[in-house]
């Protein structure tokens, strides 16, 4: 679908990675229960907000559905008697707000379909599993050599992506992973160019990219088949998790997660960087690197879901790099994502936030120096190293790789130009989103500063000074006016003195009465 084409009927080009925030604005009593009015907002614009009304029982159901994550969420306890009391309702409302905050601020919980339905029922009312089954059934009717073994429910975080374990009837012992995914808001390739790009990916056979065996795209979705790794992803390896389990169960609160040995960090990191360099040199943009998108096959790391950028689905780490305006290219996004991945390989968990200037104690100082070059405040402001510069760091430069020949992806000039145009459009959308977010943050800081106690005191002092200055100026004005009024009489007196002449005086006669009367 090109930029000028309209999306398929009923299709919503919604970016599921845009954060949702929720604030309980009020509560209302209706007969035997209380309803809470929740204001939900997508992104930073207050114009993109709506209200949902929820009862305590709805919050309780949400909490129960999220218990699989292994995290104790701060849901206020139930109360059967006295639950209509005004003070109790106010206290419960504060507790429910804390419950919502803990969910919307958690990077995995906030992306779950259960939470999205709770906060945004209008946009998440579709049954994506049913839609995927319909699409997959149509595919199997056209290609009978494939057979579905079982659906793999909730193994990935994407709401609009479903997985199935399948087999090839001609090779019944082999297992394959079929995924169906809805095309996303960053799809900027035309249908024809997208088909050419997917054909290119299915033809690739290089060490550091997971092979894509089959692909089929429609106007609104794509169906993909690749080998299934029983050992799971790199994140499964770090978390000591089984690949077929729910992602919330595996990754929200892993009990056995552990960082890798230095030798593994060096080898895996170098192989992943070589995979990124291969894509960049071929003009193929990625932007979706994380430990769940890397599999380890006999000691070799392979990048998965390379097609995500072409299909237009948003990056899992988009909320993390969007606030950082220096990360505004797909290559920069890949380096940023590599920093996240390297941190997780080192410490056994992803970083809580970025920029990051303080690191836990680590036995590998060489790793920390590379992390600082990517994730520190200075790096995020001034710029990060390129993939080639990372390969040349002491941490990765001495890693011995097995292949001897130079790897490359041969892309036709027409497709390369289409990929370049799509890449520029993707980066333009990111930069526009960063601009809007930057303006919002500046406005928020200004408003916060304006309302701070220190600023209020400063304005009061300034107002007093202005008041005193104004009073002083008023006094001066009165004095000047008085001087002006008396100035006329003074001038007349001076004038009469200067023009005095004796001749103008009238002659007067007087009787001399000094003599005594006789």
PLM regions and their residue ranges:
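Regulatory extensions appended to serine/threonine kinase catalytic cores
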Residues: 402-486, 492-496
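C-lobe/activation-segment region of protein kinase-like
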Residues: 302-304, 308-370
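Terminal C-lobe "cap" of eukaryotic-type protein kinase domains
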Residues: 377-407
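Phox homology (PX) phosphoinositide-binding domain
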Residues: 1-187, 196
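Short beta-strand micro-motifs within the conserved protein kinase catalytic domain, predominantly
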Residues: 211-222
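Conserved short submotifs of the Hanks-type protein kinase catalytic core
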Residues: 220-233, 237, 241
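Activation segment signature within eukaryotic-like protein kinase domains
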Residues: 268-269
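Catalytic-loop of the protein kinase fold
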Residues: 276-297, 303
């Amino acid at each position: 679908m090109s930029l000028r084409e309209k999306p398929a009927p009923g299709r919503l080009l919604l970016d599921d990675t845009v954060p949702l925030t929720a604030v309980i604005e009020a509560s209302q009593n209706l007969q035997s229960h209380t309803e809470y009015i929740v204001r939900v907002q997508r992104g930073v614009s207050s114009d993109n907000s709506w209200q949902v009304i929820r009862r305590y029982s709805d919050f309780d159901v949400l909490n129960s559905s999220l218990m699989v994550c292994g995290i104790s969420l701060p849901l206020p306890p139930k109360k059967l008697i006295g639950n209509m009391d005004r003070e109790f309702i106010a206290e419960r409302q504060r507790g429910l707000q804390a419950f919502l905050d803990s969910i919307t601020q958690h990077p995995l919980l906030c992306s779950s379909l259960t939470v999205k339905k709770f906060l945004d029922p209008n946009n998440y009312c579709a049954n994506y599993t049913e839609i995927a089954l319909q699409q997959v059934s149509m595919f199997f009717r056209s290609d009978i050599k494939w057979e579905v073994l079982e659906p793999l429910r909730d193994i990935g975080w994407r709401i609009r992506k479903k997985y199935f374990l399948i087999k090839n009837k001609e090779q019944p012992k082999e297992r394959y992973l079929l995924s169906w995914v809805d095309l996303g808001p960053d799809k900027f390739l035309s249908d024809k160019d997208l088909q050419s790009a997917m054909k290119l990916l299915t033809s690739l056979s290089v060490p550091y990219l997971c092979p894509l065996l089959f692909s089929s795209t429609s106007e609104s979705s794509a169906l993909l088949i690749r080998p299934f790794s029983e050992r799971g992803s790199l994140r499964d390896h770090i978390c000591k998790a089984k690949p077929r389990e729910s992602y919330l169960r595996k990754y929200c609160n892993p009990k056995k997660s552990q960082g890798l040995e230095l030798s593994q960090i060096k080898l895996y990191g170098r192989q992943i960087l070589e995979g990124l360099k291969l894509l960049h040199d071929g003009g193929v943009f990625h932007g979706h690197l994380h430990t769940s998108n890397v599999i380890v096959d006999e000691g070799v790391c392979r990048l998965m879901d390379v097609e995500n950028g072409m299909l237009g689905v948003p990056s899992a780490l988009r909320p993390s790099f969007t606030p950082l305006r220096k990360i505004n290219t797909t290559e920069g996004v890949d380096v940023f994502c590599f920093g996240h991945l390297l941190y997780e390989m080192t410490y056994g968990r992803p970083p809580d936030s970025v920029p990051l200037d303080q690191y836990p104690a680590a036995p590998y100082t060489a790793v920390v120096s590379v992390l600082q070059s990517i994730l520190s405040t200075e790096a995020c402001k001034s710029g990060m190293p390129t993939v080639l510069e990372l390969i040349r760091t002491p941490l990765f430069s001495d890693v011995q790789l097995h292949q001897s020949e130079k790897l490359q992806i041969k892309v036709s000039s027409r497709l390369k130009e289409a990929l370049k145009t799509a890449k520029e459009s993707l980066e333009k959308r990111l930069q526009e989103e960063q601009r809007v977010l930057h303006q919002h943050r500046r406005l928020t800081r200004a408003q916060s500063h304006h309302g701070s106690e220190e600023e209020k005191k400063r304005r009061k002092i300034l107002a007093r000074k202005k008041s005193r200055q104004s009073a002083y100026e008023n006094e001066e004005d009165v004095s000047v006016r008085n001087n002006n009024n008396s100035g006329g009489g003074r001038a007349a007196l001076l004038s009469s003195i200067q023009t005095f002449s004796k001749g103008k005086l009238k002659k007067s006669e007087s009787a001399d009465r000094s003599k005594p009367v006789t």
